[in-house]
Design a protein with these regions (language model features):
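Beta-rich, blade/repeat-based domains predominating
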Residues: 37-49, 83-84, 105-128, 146, ...
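Short loop/turn segments that connect beta-strands within beta-propeller blades
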Residues: 90-95, 152-157, 211-215, 261-266, ...
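Short glycine/acidic-enriched loop and turn motifs that connect beta-strands
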Residues: 59-63, 136-140, 204-206, 248-251, ...
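Generic structural signal for coil-to-beta-strand starts
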Residues: 51, 95, 127-130, 148, ...
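Blade-loop segments of beta-propeller domains
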Residues: 69-92, 96-123
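Beta-propeller fold detector
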Residues: 32-33, 96-103, 156-167, 217-223, ...
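A short loop-to-beta-strand structural motif that recurs across blades of beta-propeller domains
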Residues: 75, 83-88, 147-150, 206-209, ...
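Residue position within the beta-strands of beta-propeller blades
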Residues: 53-57, 130-133, 199, 242-245, ...
Length: 362
């Protein structure tokens, strides 16, 4: 079924104005709650042990760095920060335990809703777990910290293996947006391919390759080609990267799209007329699934998130509807999708969920 979506804006973490709209909703029948108790759940991946690892933005904090370093422009900034981010894991039976906590977490200004970011995503290289930080940096209220890639050690400690704050500051993109510029970046999603990590940064607009402990290389300056379109989601199909975007405020109908980026950085648009993309994933048959945060509303609205499957050129089949402020998704070993739900916003703490979406057999 082809759908002409009305775009809603998901703006948390990305330096764009946000209003959370509450409403009544009903999830599609193939959606169930798999686990609860998360603080702003974000990217999630299954590990080699069969457990699901969930990154959490945390609950922000009250520490300020005003007067110490450059701040994110108002009304998004100034940020405050704390060490409330964490990574949790969920067993196949739904039992939740903490892998590592006390990681950097920040929140926007009160005028912007105290919206939280922290650990943005996780990925495995072999049996080693890595985390993508978006909640650190002096511009986010935490002096002496940096956004980057953390290696999670067997004893639960972490080691910084790539300083992405430093990389951004010394390798500017062609077309940064000064009105909401984030010095430390607002990293969003990460995938592993061939033992290398690939991460998307929405505020600057880039896809970067990270060799843990070695070096960082920009694969594509999306801002140079597309301008400030706020790329968020990345998936890899074994040959190329696929990147989805939110687009910017004010709202424009059907403004999100999916782009293909080759390992050489060549970019082409492959799917259009989508809304508020926050997740992409391929199934075992190579079919692409798209997670939309909101549709049919002018602002992010609970109960209007959806998962679509690409069935031909700009034809999309609904797989799940009625999701509430979803932020990421991944396929499980059972062939079903797992989605971070109630994944952004201010407290209450512990309101985040992971949903299980049974994917139709067709």
């Amino acid at each position: 079924m082809t759908r002409d979506w009305r775009v809603g804006k998901f703006c948390a973490l990305l330096g764009i104005g946000l209003c959370l709209v509450q409403g009544l909703w009903a999830q599609s029948k193939n959606v169930s709650v798999f686990a609860t108790g998360f603080n702003n759940p974000r990217g999630l991946k299954f590990g080699p042990d069969g457990d699901l690892y969930v990154s959490e933005g945390g609950a922000g904090g009250t520490t300020s760095t005003q007067g110490i370093c450059p701040q994110v422009p108002s009304p998004v900034g100034p940020y405050t920060g704390g060490f409330t981010g964490r990574i949790s894991k969920v067993t196949p039976a739904g039992t939740v335990t903490t892998v590592v906590d006390h990681l950097p977490s920040n929140e926007t200004s009160a005028a912007q809703g105290n919206l939280v970011s922290g650990v943005a995503d996780v990925a495995f290289v072999g049996h080693t777990l890595y985390a993508l930080l978006a909640g650190a940096g002096c511009s986010h209220g935490l002096a002496g910290t940096h956004n980057g890639i953390l290696r999670v050690n067997p004893d639960g400690s972490t080691t910084m293996v790539a300083n992405l704050s430093h990389f951004l500051k010394h390798n500017p993109v062609a077309n940064p947006n000064p009105g909401d510029f984030e010095p430390d970046g607002t990293w969003y999603s990460m995938v592993e391919a061939y033992g290398v990590l690939f991460a998307i940064e929405p505020n600057h607009g880039e896809l970067d390759a990270i060799w843990p402990g070695a070096f960082i290389q920009r694969i594509a300056d999306i801002s140079r080609i597309q301008g400030h379109i706020v790329p968020t989601a990345v998936a890899f199909n074994g040959a190329d990267f696929f990147v989805g975007n939110l687009d910017t405020f004010p709202i424009k109908d059907g403004s999100s799209k999916v782009m293909k980026i080759t390992p050489r950085g060549e970019l082409t648009t492959v799917y259009i007329n989508l809304s508020d993309i926050v997740g992409l994933a391929f199934d075992k048959k190579g079919r692409l699934y798209v997670l939309e945060n909101t549709s049919g509303n002018q602002y992010p609205t609970a109960g209007t998130g959806a998962i679509l499957r690409v069935d031909g050129k700009n034809n999309y089949k609904e797989i799940a509807t009625g999701l509430s402020l979803p932020t990421a998704m991944t396929f499980g070993p059972d062939g079903n999708l797992y989605v971070s739900n109630f994944g952004f916003g201010p407290p209450p703490v512990g309101a985040g969920q992971v949903l299980k979406v049974v994917v139709p057999a067709d």
